[in-house]
Amino acid sequence: MKTTLASLKKGQKATITDFNIDAIPLKLLEMGCLPGNIVELLQVAPLGDPIYITVNDSHVAIRRETAIEIDVELLQEFLL
């Protein structure tokens, strides 16, 4: 089952595995939102958009529509 950044719950960490290059802003790539890097979901806005993440020691708010385009794999400690 494919997991996306948008499906993480608050506090969960995951490794970025893939993304749709055409849907990701260049600024996110420059900040380290790349395959192999660990991302953590810090907060979700009251209406569910945007979401607040940390990646590569940077805190970033991104739209849910962008987060859906980023595939992740949950870190072992968060798997049930």
Language-model regions: role of each:
Residues 1-80:
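Compact, glycine-rich, soluble single-domain proteins
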